[in-house]
Amino acid sequence: MSGFLIANALLFLVVTAYAVYLFVYLVKTRLAYIRLGQKEQFDKRIKERLQAIWVNVFGQKKLLKDKKSGMIHVMFFYGFILVQFGAIDFIIKGLAPDRNLPLGPVYPAFTFFQEIVTFLILIAVGWAFYRRYIEKLVRLKRNFKAGLVLIFIGGLMLTVLLGNGMNLIWHEHGLSWSEPIASCIAFLLGGVGKTGAAVIFYIAWWVHLLFLLSFLVYVPQSKHAHLIAGPANVFFNRMESAGKLEKIDFTDETKESYGAGRIEDFRQSQLLDLYACVECGRCTNMCPATGTGKMLSPMDLILRLRDHLTEKGAAVTSRSPWVPAAAFRHTRGNQLAAASAGSGSQEAAAALDYNPSLIGDVITEEEIWACTTCRNCEDQCPVMNEHVDKIIDLRRYLVLTEGKMDSDAQRAMTSIERQGNPWGLNRKERENWRDAASDAEIPTVKEMKKEGKEFEYLFWVGSMGSYDNRSQKIAVSFAKLLNHAGVSFAILGNKEKNSGDTPRRLGNEFLFQELAEKNISEFEKNDVKKIVTIDPHAYNLFKNEYPDFGFEGEVYHHTEVLAELVKNGKLKPQHQLHETITFHDSCYLGRYNEVYDPPREILKAIPGVELIEMERNRETGMCCGAGGGLMWMEEETGNRINVARTEQALAVSPSVISSGCPYCLTMLGDGTKAKEAEDQVKTYDVAELLAQSVLGADMIMGERP
């Protein structure tokens, strides 16, 4: 027996060392691929980053947004960590028979706990199998790779239980309360005898070891690379405002192109995202583009970028992405690595011509322009991947380097550049919306200065509030409420320009920066300290992105200011409205800035209002379809996003659909028309509803467009 044990131990060391070598090689290979990306500065906010690890890795916060899948993963995650101690104990039993972890009197409790955890993991395996292959969740893939990990995990659990059962027979330990499942197995298979039990034990032991080491090698070259890349991605995730876009330095004369035209144009943190992807499909499941039949799928976009990075990385670094290399010699990645290294067959050498276009061959332009930048994908991602900034970088390359843009979007860009608004209306008519509110005091900054008066807030009206007839009524309602509450404010009037959100989200960074610099100059010239706006897109820009260009000031959304005025008693809702209202969360107000409560607090304060929530509300709320510059583009594929969102609102039978965004209100208003429900269901901004309740009949609400 001693000779067998020596041979067994030597073989164990050789096989384990080889598996560990392959694992280290694969991790270093993926790191080499990631390093092809653009370097970036790391802010070293270690404490906050460790807190993110604690909350999202160990706390599984984002995973638990989907309770069923989240609980399965929690069982896998903690179960797999805990059973590793049992695996060590099992390996010791194979290397030194009748030995175990030196836990003394605690050992029986340890084995009992291990068996319970092992049993729970087997339940989780069965549950996961059911969800994927029987319930057939649309967002989950059902290929061989998807099932392989269930085989690995299930095999690991079954072999350790079988091995422990045989160990009881082999060493005549007898049945034990501390190993209930192993004891059942020993009872059922007791007829095999000591020798038979020893043989079966070592078969189970080696199968368990091979499963474990195969899984170790499989992890870095599969979707389970997220076990390594996921925590790293959470740690290195941006600590600043969600969805904030990177500034392009146009003064850098060494740049030959802008945006991402090649995979290596992405930042290294963006490339880390690709290997962190869990392939859970939650992003795609929530995407408004995917849900309405568009070509874009956030998960598929990440996976195709990942596969392209792997192949490009193999060609550039000569490191084979798939090992053992002999088993994967026909894969494209390994052929590219062999060709790059100057070795391999003629077939491999031909693969060196690998040079697909990132935009066109890997990701289509149709996908790039389908994104509404709503960030529902990012909000759902359990490993904190960022999809939107990659799409914007692809748009930047198309617009700034290749000069490509949708014709309708280009028309809006030209109008913004020439007249400061997407319609191309006369810039000198920007303040004319005040004419419809002769009974309200809406001074310009110039008029206030002329009278020697000061103002607390600069009211940024925005292009929608200034030119769109329906949105002008929101601006008027808000202005009258500020007047009623005694809040001093002023507008820039004809000096106001477009905020730049549309150009930036459509990829025209140059125009955005030009507008931002001019707007900031105007703010500084007029000593602006506080800005309030009815436009969530401008709100997000001023609050989170303008500071990159030197802006310093407080920024508020109009619902934040109104909620505070109601709370302080300066605005008193007193007239009953008798409406059943459902509130639509603007993406740039909600997911980008987590402003969910103020508009709801306002609606709840209005007498006679019953507030009912849509199934998808707050952080899971669906986009109206206007974001990302799509307000100015036609939807040519699938169903209209605004109609889909309107259907969700109509499903709860409201009399009013409310919002805190002029873009959303326009899209939802069009949606009620498309569903022929405009006579039964009205669309109003929160400010309009509050004005009606505070001011009563003296305040005529805006009619539906």
Kindly label every feature range from the protein language model:
Residues C277-C283, C287, L301, C371-C377, ...:
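Short cysteine clusters
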Residues V14-Y21, L122, G154-L158, V199-F235:
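Alpha-helical membrane-embedded segments
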Residues L22-E40, K93-A96, A128-G147, L162-W177, ...:
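Juxtamembrane/interface segments at transmembrane-helix termini
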Residues G243-M299:
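Non-transmembrane accessory domains of multi-pass membrane transporters/channels
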Residues V461-H557, Y588-A605, V609-P705:
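Cofactor-cradling patches in redox/metallo enzymes
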Residues V74-F85, V149-H171:
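Hydrophobic alpha-helical membrane-insertion segments
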Residues S2-W127, I134, D265-L274, L296-D300, ...:
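Iron-sulfur-cluster electron-transfer modules
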Residues G94-A109, M166-I200:
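Membrane-interfacial helical/loop segments at transmembrane boundaries in membrane proteins
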